[in-house]
Amino acid sequence: MTNIRKTHPLMKIINHSFIDLPAPSNISAWWNFGSLLGICLIIQILTGLFLAMHYTSDTMTAFSSVTHICRDVNYGWLIRYMHANGASMFFICLFLHVGRGLYYGSYTYFETWNIGVILLLAVMATAFMGYVLPWGQMSFWGATVITNLLSAIPYIGTTLVEWIWGGFSVDKATLTRFFAFHFILPFIITALVMVHLLFLHETGSNNPSGLISDSDKIPFHPYYTIKDILGILLLILMLMILVLFSPDLLGDPDNYTPANPLNTPPHIKPEWYFLFAYAILRSIPNKLGGVLALVLSILILMLFPILHMSKQRSMMFRPLSQCMFWILVADLFTLTWIGGQPVEYPFIIIGQLASILYFTIILLILPTISLFENKLLKW
């Protein structure tokens, strides 16, 4: 008699995805972030669901309802901070997952990569709308500033912004629709994740060497299930340390002040995971130019398969490309730091230089170095 997991229509899908899946024998801990992102998504959906049971999306009561969750709901403070800091863990895993893909050339799986970029954009949109919901000062002004950027679009800009706002400013209608979108998007993300996995399982996983590993595959279970469980335990440990010891470490104190349209905070800035893009936006003195640079800073990821000039897939055996990759990482850290600084000398010029370097490395330096390394192979 054949095992039920191999014959049952539903179990068969799970079996081929998580149990009998042939996986390369040499994938490192950098391949753990896919499962960690899955866990992050589950944590966010569950905590979000329980928060939504007590939250009210009305400008008069939104701030109070969040306070009520933290003070009066059983373990409400825990749920709220797990959700807020869970988003930070989500983005840490996302950035590491994307960085892994860039380093080891995983972007040559065209469909998987492009759906991944769409997923990144969807998660960023969800996080932005979630940040607006507590209706604190930074929520309100963040929503005002970021939605206002759409007014830079020629001809339809102003109409588009007012349509998104549902009025002539960020108000009750905006908050209500942001709550609705923030609730539905994670489920759309879940569906996209399934498509992401579908395309990944068409080709199989990449591995650190970037070489075809068909001749040396091992079953996913028990080897990588155990490895993933270790990663998940470490993720939960880090999340709970953050939640229980310093829940407001990554937040903004301004968001503990209720939203006031008559009082602008001295420094409007988004959550830490958007600061690199915010720095690129601010580094261009023109509104439309800044918005284009902001969008391109993420969409440029879609160009990686086209810009790949090397004869080798992975950077494992390409020291010059490795060097440039880590300079790019350092540049992103610099942009993140600049995004949180006020708009004054010397931060303006540092931000502009870091933004230029970001695009130059990706569009020019990495492809050129790859071609040079191809020449070195012939020596």
From Swiss-Prot:
Sorted alphabetically, the Gene Ontology BP terms of this entry are: mitochondrial electron transport, ubiquinol to cytochrome c
- List, alphabetically, the CDD domains matched: cytochrome_b_C, Cytochrome_b_N
A GO-annotated cellular component: respiratory chain complex III
Q: Which domain of life is it from?
A: Eukaryota
Please list the residues that bind a ubiquinone: H201
SUPFAM superfamilies named in the record: a domain/subunit of cytochrome bc1 complex (Ubiquinol-cytochrome c reductase) (SSF81648), Transmembrane di-heme cytochromes (SSF81342)
Location of this chain's protein in the cell: Mitochondrion inner membrane
State its cofactor. heme b
Give any GO molecular function from the UniProt entry.
metal ion binding
- Coiled-coil boundaries: none
Keywords of this entry: Electron transport, Heme, Iron, Membrane, Metal-binding, Mitochondrion, Mitochondrion inner membrane, Respiratory chain, Transmembrane, Transmembrane helix, Transport, Ubiquinone
Ranges annotated as spanning the membrane: 33-53, 77-98, 113-133, 178-198, 226-246, 288-308, 320-340, 347-367
Q: Quote the subunit structure annotation.
A: The cytochrome bc1 complex contains 11 subunits: 3 respiratory subunits (MT-CYB, CYC1 and UQCRFS1), 2 core proteins (UQCRC1 and UQCRC2) and 6 low-molecular weight proteins (UQCRH/QCR6, UQCRB/QCR7, UQCRQ/QCR8, UQCR10/QCR9, UQCR11/QCR10 and a cleavage product of UQCRFS1). This cytochrome bc1 complex then forms a dimer.
Stated family: Belongs to the cytochrome b family.
**What is the protein's given name?**
Cytochrome b
What organism is this sequence from?
Neotamias bulleri (Buller's chipmunk)
Q: Which gene encodes it?
A: MT-CYB
